Amino acid sequence: MTNIRKTHPLLKIINSSFVDLPAPSSLSSWWNFGSLLGVCFGVQILTGLFLAMHYTSDTATAFNSVTHICRDVNYGWLLRYLHANGASMFFICLYLHVGRGLYYGSYTYSETWNIGILLLFAVMATAFMGYVLPWGQMSFWGATVITNLLSAIPYIGTDLVQWIWGGFSVDKATLTRFFAFHFLPPFIVTALVMVHLLFLHETGSNNPTGIPSDPDMIHSHPYYTIKDILGFLVMLTALASLVLFSPDLLGDPDNYIPANPLTTPPHIKPEWYFLFAYAILRSIPNKLGGVLALVMSILILAIVPILHMSKQRSMMFRPLSQCLFWLLVAVLFTLTWIGGQPVEHPYIIIGQTASVLYFLIILFLMPMISLVENYLLKW
């Protein structure tokens, strides 16, 4: 008798996507991050749902409702810190996932890559709106500064900002709509993830060598499901350790002060996972130029497939490109550090140098070094 998982209309979709899915036999642990993102996303939706049951999106009570969740709700502190640190874990996995795609040339699957960029923008917008909800000092001033960037858009900028605020400043209307929009995008992200996987399964997975692996495929289950479960355990252990031992390590102390429009924090900054983009924004003295650089720092990923000049797909056998890739990683770490520092010497010049290097490496140096490697292959 034919197995039900291969004949049932619903089960056969799951079967072809996760169980009998052919996968290259050489996938390394860098291919674990897609499934880890799925687990992180599940944790975020569950904890977010329970937090939404107790949270109130009103400027008078928002801060107190978060305090109430931590003090009075059964395991509310656990929900709150799982959600906050789960976002950090989500972005760690996300950046490693994108980095893997850049290193091994997965961006040549352009549909999957472009949906991934859309996902990145959607997740970043969701996380930003979530940061506003506790209504602490950094929430309020972060929302004010970041939304104000839209005023750099010619003609419609100021009207657009006031439309988003729902008034002439960040206030009750802003908080209410940010809560609504923080709750909605995760479901849009879920749909985009399905499209992302649909396009991925059309082409099949890339592998570390970058060479077509059609003659050498294995079943995803049990081989890669076991490997994924190990990844889940490692990541959930790291998340549990962070939540239980040092829940405020990645947060900002200013967010434990209730929002006050009359007092500005000494240094306004977003969450740590946006600091690299924030540093690029601040490194340009012109407002519109800074906003364009901020958007381009992420959107530049969309033109990476066009800039691929190498005859080889993966960087596995391209030592010169590898050096540039790790230089890019170092630049991103530098930008993240600079984004958290005050705007003063020597941080300004370091940030500007790192920002120039970031765009220089992706737009010019990587394509040029690929052409050099192509030339060396002829020898």
UniProtKB/Swiss-Prot annotation:
Its main location: mitochondrion. It is a multi-pass membrane protein. GO terms for biological process: mitochondrial electron transport, ubiquinol to cytochrome c. The keyword Membrane applies. A ubiquinone binds at H201. Binds 2 heme b groups non-covalently. It is found in: Mitochondrion inner membrane. The keyword Hydrolase does not apply. GO terms for cellular component: mitochondrial inner membrane; respiratory chain complex III. The chain crosses the membrane at residues 33-53, 77-98, 113-133, 178-198, 226-246, 288-308, 320-340, 347-367. Pfam families: Cytochrom_B_C, Cytochrome_B. Heme b b562 binds at H83, H182. Heme b b566 binds at H97, H196. Keywords: Electron transport, Heme, Iron, Membrane, Metal-binding, Mitochondrion, Mitochondrion inner membrane, Respiratory chain, Transmembrane, Transmembrane helix, Transport, Ubiquinone. InterPro entries: Cyt_b/b6_C, Cyt_b/b6_C_sf, Cyt_b/b6_N, Cytb/b6-like_sf, Cytochrome_b, Cytochrome_b_C_euk/bac, Cytochrome_b_N_euk/bac, Di-haem_cyt_TM. One of its GO terms (molecular function) is metal ion binding. Its cofactor is heme b. The cytochrome bc1 complex contains 11 subunits: 3 respiratory subunits (MT-CYB, CYC1 and UQCRFS1), 2 core proteins (UQCRC1 and UQCRC2) and 6 low-molecular weight proteins (UQCRH/QCR6, UQCRB/QCR7, UQCRQ/QCR8, UQCR10/QCR9, UQCR11/QCR10 and a cleavage product of UQCRFS1). This cytochrome bc1 complex then forms a dimer. Heme 1 (or BL or b562) is low-potential and absorbs at about 562 nm, and heme 2 (or BH or b566) is high-potential and absorbs at about 566 nm. Belongs to the cytochrome b family. Component of the ubiquinol-cytochrome c reductase complex (complex III or cytochrome b-c1 complex) that is part of the mitochondrial respiratory chain. The b-c1 complex mediates electron transfer from ubiquinol to cytochrome c. Contributes to the generation of a proton gradient across the mitochondrial membrane that is then used for ATP synthesis. PANTHER family: CYTOCHROME B. This is Cytochrome b. It comes from Artibeus jamaicensis (Jamaican fruit-eating bat).
